[in-house]
Amino acid sequence: MENQDYFCSVIRDVKFGENVKIYGFVNLYGCEIGDCTRIGAFVEIQKGANIGANCKISSHSFICEGVTLEDGVFVGHQVAFINDRYPRATNATGQLQSEQDWFMERTLVKRGASIGSGSVILSNITIGENAIVGAGSVVTKDVPANAIVAGNPARLIRYVTTEEPVAAVYERRKTGAHRAPLQ
């Protein structure tokens, strides 16, 4: 594991793969991080979360217990995963909730998916392989493989196509040809 700065970071009981890179001011505990994953500053990853290999988790993101990111997942800045759809401070008797009162739901983000900055991913969701969640989206239900979803709530926009080789997409990005002219 390589780090830029451990100052004011809490890293406890974490299983790290090879060549993991962590930037400062993180809170990681009881989770697993796969090989060659990059974790930005001000990220929290809770116990029981599993992060695959070659993932990128951008700054200020929150990954809670019960979340699994498969290999090659991108998480933009300020993404929040939720593992309880009906959170309450107190139980039915008015006492502060304990672990026994809490019902955690799991979330799975499959290989190669990308989640745009500022998105919120509710619990009990599966985001399919190579799916793209647009920035600022609120994902309330499963996202199919290769789907592009956006909005609040997130809705299907279209599907990613495999007709264009990846190299051609990167070439268009370098030249700026992917941008529409301003009207």
Regions found by a protein language model. Give the residues of each.
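Short, low-complexity intrinsically disordered segments enriched in A/P/G/S/L with frequent Arg
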Residues: 168, 172, 176, 180-181
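C-terminal/domain-terminus segments
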Residues: 125-148
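Flexible, glycine/small-residue-enriched loop-and-beta-strand segment within the central core
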Residues: 1-15, 22-125, 153, 160-161, ...
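Hydrophobic residues at beta-strand termini and immediately following loops
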Residues: 149, 157
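Short, basic, low-complexity termini and linkers enriched in Ser/Thr/Gly/Pro
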Residues: 1, 180-183
